[in-house]
Structure formats: structure tokens, C-alpha cells
A protein has these predicted regions:
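Short N-terminal edge-element motif at the start of the domain
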Residues: 10-42
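Short, low-complexity, polar/charged sequence segments that are solvent-exposed and flexible
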Residues: 22-26, 53-55, 83-87, 122
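Solvent-exposed loop and beta-edge segments used for protein-protein assembly and interaction
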Residues: 26-28, 56-60, 95-97, 136
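Short acidic, glycine-rich loop/turn motifs
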Residues: 7, 36-40, 115-117, 146
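Short beta-strand and beta-hairpin "edge-sheet" elements
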Residues: 29-72
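Oligomerization/assembly interface segments of phage tail-like spikes and tubes
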Residues: 1-13, 58-71, 140
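Short, surface-exposed beta-strand/loop "edge" segments at domain boundaries and coil↔beta transitions
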Residues: 11-14, 40-45, 110-114, 149-152
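Intrinsically disordered, low-complexity segments enriched in serine, threonine, and glycine
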Residues: 71-159
């Protein structure tokens, strides 16, 4: 996905090339997080290229193109925390992009975690990333048995 931007500046022409050079050094070829004014809750990740500049009627315009990943990501990770005493079914609702959550457990004993029936783990206190616990778009149910606190954190992405 390509995003194109045009930035206008009103500086004297003898300062414009210096300004253009500063912008080019700051952006050109760099992979950056890009937050659009029209979509402030998300960011895009892309490599930016400062393509050219024009000067019309003492208004300088600098053109920037960014080749971005197809998904826009929420600014903050989604976090679901649950205190478990017995058996709890926890629903993790995810956007379009598949994600593997970071799991943090605080428990005196282990917690039994079941995802999609055939993925079962017994985990004690600590932080984990389980590749088989991949969240799909929509509601994802995880069954947790034991006593303790479990937290799921992941980066959501949408088109």
C-alpha cells in the first residue's frame, strides 16, 4: 500500500534547499511508523522516499511516498487480564491480522490453558509466547483452569 504526502513550506528560496535536505535526511529510505490525521487510533509501518520538490509562487512543496505494510496497527496493544479461580472461558476478540499474544501468568501453581481443543498447556508463573495460540479474526475462546491471574497482550491489525 502506498501513501503519498505533499508538504508545503513558506521559506525564502535560499533556505528551501536546506529545508528539503533536512526532510530528506530525516525520512528518505527509513522504515517508520506513520500516523495519519484521519485515522489517529492506528499507525502504518512503511519505508519513506522523498521524491521531489517544487516551488510555485514562493510556496515550496516536498513530495513523500511511503510503501507500507498492508495492515494498519492499533496504537496500543490489546490487553485482556482475568483473575481465574476454577475454570474460566476467556474470549479474545481480534481484528483481521492474525496475532500470537504474549501471555503473562501469576499463580502459585500452574494454570491449564486450552485453545481450539487440541492445544493444551500447563504453565506456571512467567511470560510466554505460544505459536500455536494464534488468534484469528473475531472471537477466540481460551479455557483456563486453576487459580491465578492471566494476561494476554497482542498487536491488532486491520486493513
Amino acid at each position: 500500500m502506498t501513501h503519498k504526502f505533499a508538504f508545503n513550506t513558506i521559506v525564502p528560496w535560499n533556505d528551501f534547499l536546506s529545508q528539503y535536505s533536512k526532510v530528506k535526511n530525516a525520512l528518505h529510505g527509513k522504515k517508520l511508523r506513520i500516523i495519519l490525521d484521519d485515522d489517529p487510533g492506528f499507525y502504518y509501518v512503511g519505508r519513506c522516499y522523498v521524491s521531489n520538490f517544487t516551488n510555485e509562487k514562493n510556496i515550496g512543496t516536498i513530495s513523500v511516498e511511503c510503501e507500507c505494510e498492508p495492515y494498519k496497527c492499533k496504537l496500543a496493544k490489546t490487553v485482556v487480564t482475568k483473575a481465574v479461580a476454577g475454570t474460566e472461558v476467556i474470549t479474545l476478540t481480534n481484528s483481521r491480522k492474525r496475532a500470537v499474544p504474549e501471555i503473562t501468568i501469576t499463580a502459585d501453581t500452574s494454570l491449564n490453558i486450552v485453545y481450539q481443543t487440541y492445544n493444551v498447556w500447563d504453565l506456571g508463573s512467567g511470560s510466554y509466547t505460544l505459536p500455536d495460540l494464534e488468534l484469528l479474526e473475531g472471537a477466540n475462546e481460551v479455557t483456563v483452569t486453576g487459580t491465578g491471574t492471566i494476561s494476554f497482550a497482542w498487536q491488532e491489525g486491520a486493513l
